[in-house]
Amino acid sequence: MVNTQNQISQTSDLDYIVNQPYKYGFTTSVESEQFPRGISREVVKLISKKKNEPEYLLNFRLKAYEKWTKMKNPKWAHLKHPNIDFNSIIYYAVPKLKKELNSLDEVDPEILDTFNKLGISLNEQKRLSNVAVDAVFDSVSIATTFKKELAEAGVIFCSISEAIRNYPDLIQKYLGTVVPSGDNYFAALNSAVFSDGSFCYIPPDTVCPLELSTYFRINNEESGQFERTLIVADRGSKVSYLEGCTAPQYDTNQLHAAIVELIALDDAEIKYSTVQNWYAGNKDGKGGIYNFVTKRGLCSGKNSKISWTQVETGSAITWKYPGCILAGDNSQGEFYSVALTNNYQEADTGTKMIHIGNNTKSKIISKGISAGKSKNSYRGLVKIGPQSFNSRNYSQCDSLLIGQSSQANTFPYIQVQNPTAKVEHEASTSKISEDQIFYFLQRGINLEESVSLMISGFCKDVFNELPMEFAVEADRLLSLKLEGTVG
């Protein structure tokens, strides 16, 4: 008989697989232009001047900065990390480029090579034919593909800097309407210093002909990344948006504080998918990205729908709660999430579903996986307002523990203010057992593959919601991160 306990707990198995090298940890050597370290009113003005922004946007930034200086860094999350020295960060760092890039031939070959190594070809002839990409490197958008094809359908997809110049009416109308500049500490910081990001507008009665995607890459060790994404789906339109990210392997920590605003008008649908693979630090907890992100969608129109799907495997610290405000009657919000922590990673993530309109529906499927000495917390809010009649919510929060030293926590908050509402909440915590492993081993399946199969089964409800390319990548990513963590 196989001694299952010995095989599961072998240190060599654990070390071999838990500490697989982070293959995106390389750095790119490029000449860059950057501001001195530190944040001040003058730095905020410099960012706005550098980007030649209109006065209303400068005022937006300055008001956000004033709010930020009066706010305190939130301490309520189930996270423990050193205080962030905001004056040690460079808030603007861009590779030296021409002011206007007319073709990829004018982009530094080192940068193009970086995205090729990441599997993100910016050459349209070599790209997947159904995906348009906006590539962001440190503080600037490098290139956006298939803009011509999208424009023929009336779809606007470009960097937010370009949108500020070319579509000022749309930016002024929608920017900051879902995530106000003073929404929270990190949203205020982003609103003051954001330098680039993506903008997407889908015109009425249009199904976007391509998947839209943005890939974020932090390269500079001393800079933070503060991108801003704004997606507007006009009445009767539909769009699917993909987001990916990586960073070099440094012993220090870098700050990523982003904002994503989604707006769905009458009968519109937005599907937003993320595979987050920032550098998570080494096996001793040294280095890694501090990921403090505000993501929110507004279903402002009747019959509108916003769906968030995320796979979180990276970052030393993750603080992130994508949510939906269901203001339109019959609107729907969905949240599908897999959050993996390993070694000394810490994640406090979840969602908020705010029901305002009548007959609104929300669905939450959260899968948390904790390994090593990590902490993984789900924090969710379901709120049904007094005027939201016949609204429904279903929440399912499952945690899986791997090893003896990891933690899983769930902090659900449910507030129902209307007697016609129906709310269901399920939660479970489980562990990969010896019996399960033994079952696989007896059928000739090795330990690593056994763990991988069980993880895939645990996460399938979320993976099924991802676009096919992302689902395959997410499954492979979890297998790589979790192999051999049973102990």
UniProtKB/Swiss-Prot annotation:
NCBIfam families tied to this protein: PRK11814.1 (NF008773), sufB (TIGR01980)
Protein name: Iron-sulfur cluster assembly SufBD family protein ycf24
Keyword set includes Nucleotide-binding: no
Keywords, sorted A to Z: Chloroplast, Plastid
Subcellular locations according to the entry: Plastid, Chloroplast
Similarity comment: family membership: Belongs to the iron-sulfur cluster assembly SufBD family.
Gene behind this protein: ycf24
GO biological process, one term: iron-sulfur cluster assembly
GO CC terms in record: chloroplast
Species lineage: Eukaryota, Rhodophyta, Bangiophyceae, Bangiales, Bangiaceae
